[in-house]
Amino acid sequence: MKVISSIQELRDQLRGQNRTAFVPTMGNLHEGHLSLMRLARQHGDPVVASIFVNRLQFGPNEDFDKYPRTLQDDIEKLQQNNVYVLFAPTERDMYPEPQEYRVLPPDDLGGILEGEFRPGFFAGVCTVVTKLMSCVQPRVAVFGKKDYQQLMIVRRMCQQLALPVEIIAAETVRDEDGLALSSRNRYLTTDERKEAPELAKTLQRVRDSVLGGERDLGKLEQHAHTHLAERGWVPDYIAIRRRANLIAPSAAELEAGEPLVVLAAAKLGATRLIDNLEI
């Protein structure tokens, strides 16, 4: 596996490749990330991964400086998963001058849910993903369903900007107790780690209620919010939305069997966790 930091060297290395599969990450790789690499292998060749902790998608009070950086361990894991090139640029490589041009998602998708609680987050994501796509020029790119809103925004961005890349969605990988794998799970204390699977269990109960015929979605959302709060969580949102556009479904859409997803974000101690389940 080649480890490359220069954009020009990356382009030289990939010149002539027309089936490249790309997996962008921020590093601190776990089994969830590695499952994306294996899925990418099924859809293209060679597989290119990137590791770049993107300052643009961190808010002023978020964890950019303490975000775990484990490049040498990550390199070993990628080598074991047959990745052809790791693109690991420095901040100077990616942003040699201030990034004045940004890619902004529409407010009706980028300003809700995660976007409401993390202003500017999706502008940072869209900007860096567009720049990475320009560098790698993949035929397919793999994103995880765990970041459901991000997946939807990136897919729509590629469609509307006519970027010649197919976005592949990867299922969320979970620990044995149901907790979705995340680089931020390492921030949890021992007691918090024991409590953390309750987020997924709460979403499962919401899902089961909807599938069981409950149509008062607001009541389900409020009950879930209250349940987590009583256990010491600080929920940002629990929302049942249409999968197609993350808008709340109408009564008619519910009766017609509109595909739904329940999404949640909540703090447990100092750690903010997100999760979702399709319904």
Swiss-Prot record:
Provenance organism: Burkholderia cenocepacia (strain HI2424)
Residues reported to bind (R)-pantoate: 57, 150
Binding site for beta-alanine: 57
Entry annotation: catalytic residues: 33
GO MF annotation: an example: pantoate-beta-alanine ligase activity
Gene3D superfamilies: HUPs, Pantoate-beta-alanine ligase, C-terminal domain
GO CC terms of this entry: cytosol
Name under which the protein is recorded: Pantothenate synthetase
Signal peptide: none
Gene Ontology BP term (one): pantothenate biosynthetic process
Keyword Cytoplasm among record annotations: yes
Summary of the function given for this chain in its UniProt record: Catalyzes the condensation of pantoate with beta-alanine in an ATP-dependent reaction via a pantoyl-adenylate intermediate.
